[in-house]
Curated annotation (Swiss-Prot):
SMART domains: AAA (SM00382). It is a multi-pass membrane protein. The keyword Oxidoreductase does not apply. It comes from Hyphomonas neptunium (strain ATCC 15444). PANTHER family: ABC TRANSPORTER PERMEASE YTRF, MEMBRANE COMPONENT OF TRANSPORTER-RELATED. Belongs to the ABC transporter superfamily. Macrolide exporter (TC 3.A.1.122) family. CDD domains: ABC_MJ0796_LolCDE_FtsE. This is Macrolide export ATP-binding/permease protein MacB. Homodimer. The chain crosses the membrane at residues 271-291, 520-540, 577-597, 608-628. The keyword Oxidoreductase does not apply. Non-canonical ABC transporter that contains transmembrane domains (TMD), which form a pore in the inner membrane, and an ATP-binding domain (NBD), which is responsible for energy generation. Confers resistance against macrolides. ATP binds at residues 42-49.
Amino acid sequence: MTPPLIELKDVTRYYGSGDTEVRALDGVSLTIETGEFVAIVGQSGSGKSTLMNLLGCLDRPTNGRYAIRGQNVSELDPDNLAALRRETFGFIFQRYNLLASVSASENVEIPAVYAGLALSERREKAAGLLAKLGLGERVHHKPGQLSGGQQQRVAVARALVNDAEVILADEPTGALDSGSSNDLLNLLEELHASGRTIILITHDQKVAARAKRVIEIRDGKIISDSGNKQAAAEEAPQYRYARKGPSPIAQVAESVKMAFRSLRANLFRTALTLLGVVIGVSAVVAMLAIGEGSRAEVMARFESMGPNLLFVRPGAPGTRMRGGAIATLTLEDAQALGELENILAAVPSRSTNATLRNGGNDYSSSIEGVSETWPIAQNRDMLYGTFFTKDDVDRRIGAVVLGTTTAGNLFDDIESAVGQYVFLGGAPFEVAGILESKGASSWGQDQDDIALVPITTGMMRLFGQSYLSSITLAVDDTDRITETEAAAHAFLLARHGTEDFQIRNTASILASVEETQNSFSILLGSVAAISLLVGGIGVMNIMLVSVSERTREIGVRMATGARRSDIQTQFIVESLVVGGLGGIAGVAIGFGIVFIIAQMGMTVAVTPLPAILAFSSALGTGLVFGLLPARQASRLDPVAALASE
């Protein structure tokens, strides 16, 4: 024997507990066969709407058994309940519950979306149903452009799009005029005649009289039932709750479409939400480009010094030297270090600031006393003239080699400066040559703002001191630089009898500078990341607001067959779309900022990685901060959601 289509046995539905307990349904037993036209009539508060919610699987009984074709509904998980609503029931609501932002056709298509129908099939089916219901020319009209009767016909088409076996009509004439009400009831009779089961919920006895069977409910109990006046269908259709919903790809594609529609519905709010993400992403791109540019520039300048240099400074390790005031390195130390194995050149150095004069031109520059090996160690070439020789150093001659900045401030034509005299410290110095330009140093100091004199001449005429501020050692074989550094350290330690000096190589300085620059980049990135975090909080806030504003829409989607995962996916995808759009705009604006900064002369380094990371972070932000709103949306109670204003 075939089980009845719908069977309720001793069903109760309680709300609240204790003194506040309300019995909306109290011991309801009911059987409805396939093909019946049943009206459930009762006044407000009688329990008829609660009964409809139970029949449509929007709610579960507190006690008792509700079965569809013998399958106990209480044993079904949420996904199978959603499938049951999607495949078996079609809802017609008193307030229509159409989505205001989409067309009549798209409203009709909603259940078909969750049934996994292809877009072309959905549209064809929706258009056909609307045409049969007299709305063929209003397929693309939005609900606000339709009359109440037309909106209710759209709701009927939505109920039929998945070939629903049971039509549940909840006060369908309540918001219609008498003419539209009669048209709707005629339509329900036609659907009944075609073999569908119709369950009509109403408070109006005249409306109920149009049904073949009338059940009256009062205070949660059935008080009368006119009985089944119609034979059940001989061949009952098979129960279809196990049918699967849309494929993941189709689900995501539809969610993306709905996300853009939702964002367009409130452009100003969307723009404000995107702004937070855009600021965060553009800040990440710009700041990392600035940080990387600064790091690359500093590293390039240090590397231009050559990887073969050792720097000897006076003072014990940890001692801070100021102005070369520590007298532990001498010219003899430099000469002795120059004799060590693998030392290509040992350059003694001492410097001061002084004013150079040429006629009416005065210029204050850095004056540095060095040996003839300075160009070798510093990898500097001559632009004009020659560098002074060892003989010049030994004879303490008054010669000077100028950087291009210094020469340009003293002479109108720097090429003609060679052979002329400048006054330095009150004494004349002949310009022996002009160095090739090198630009700024690692610290931003102009390396061409310099004047070089023989170290011996400087000690005698300018410095008034016989000790050095540094010795630079140029190593011949860089593979042995560590070994050479150790040898120089041991040599000076033996020579001085105490460790009153410090030796560092270019590699260690590079490592230290790189660490500092990396820390700077991390700091900049952290500041930008905080901006992105603030943007993410904005995304979560707006999505929570969206869930609150679209509660009824969520209820409609659940009633028409959306699973929890469908709702959750929809809101997560919306968050990802916000994050993605903000990421794209942020990357573009970030590159624009970088371009402007570069035009201002600041060094920047644009690489794909920061942009990819920033965009990925924006997507990740959308995902992370969209999870809570999405979960909240998917956990809404369908009945409460449909009842929300």
